[in-house]
Amino acid sequence: LQSQAGIDVVEESRKKKAENGWGFIKSFRLRVANTLSRKQHHDYSHQVYDAMAGCLACKSCAGQCPIKVNVPQFRSQFLEVYHGRYLRPLRDYIIGGTEFMLPTLAKVAPLYNALLSQRWVDSLMRKGLGMSDSPLLSRASVKKQLRAWGVAEATPASLALLTDQQRANSVIIVQDAFTSHFEAKLVMDVVELLSRLNLRVFVMPFSANGKPLQVQGFLGAFERTAEKQAKRLRALAEF
C-alpha cells in the first residue's frame, strides 16, 4: 500500500535513522499539518497503527510461530516510518527515554513514589498520557548496596588485574534499567546467591541498552545507543 502511494518505505526508514535534531525540527511543520488533517484524508496506516497498539513487544510470536514472524520488529519499523509523517504522542518520548531518566529519578525515589501514589497523579497520567499503574522505584540503591558489600565494578581496569584462574571463577552481571531501579532487591539476591556459590561477582556499571527506544520505533537513536553498549560489552568480553 505504501509503494502504491509512491512511498519508498526503506528510503524513509533510512532518512529517519540518519535524521539529526535539525532534521527533526524541519519536518515538524509537515508532521503537524498531516496530524491535523488526518481525518480529512484516508490513510490505511492509521488502522495499522491502531492494530499495532495491541502489541506488547514480548516476542512470543517470534518464538511460537513456525515461520518466526517477528511482530515487534516490523512494528518498530512501522512506527519509525509512520511518525516520520505524523506527530508522536508525548508518551512515546517518555517511554523511549525511560532508561536515561531512571538514574536521576532514583536519586529522588521517595518523592517520585509519593507523587505516583497520589490518585490525581495516576488519573492525570492515565487521561493525559495513556499510562497507568506505573511501578514505584526501589527505595534501596543498588550502587550503594554493592559498595557496602564490597562488590567490584566490572571495568577493563578491574578485570585486567585478575589471574586466569580468578577469571574462570568470576561472573559479570550486566544491569538492566528496570530490574536495577524497580527491583533492586532481586539484583542483590542474585549477587548474594552467586557469592554463596563461591563465585567472584562483578557488576557492570549501569548504561542504557536502548530497548525502550526500539520498542517505540526510535530506531536511529536505538542503533546509536545499542552500539555504545555493545562496545562496552566487547571491551569486557576481551577478558
Show which residues each predicted segment covers.
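Iron-sulfur-cluster electron-transfer modules
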Residues: R14-K15, F24-A208, L213-F239
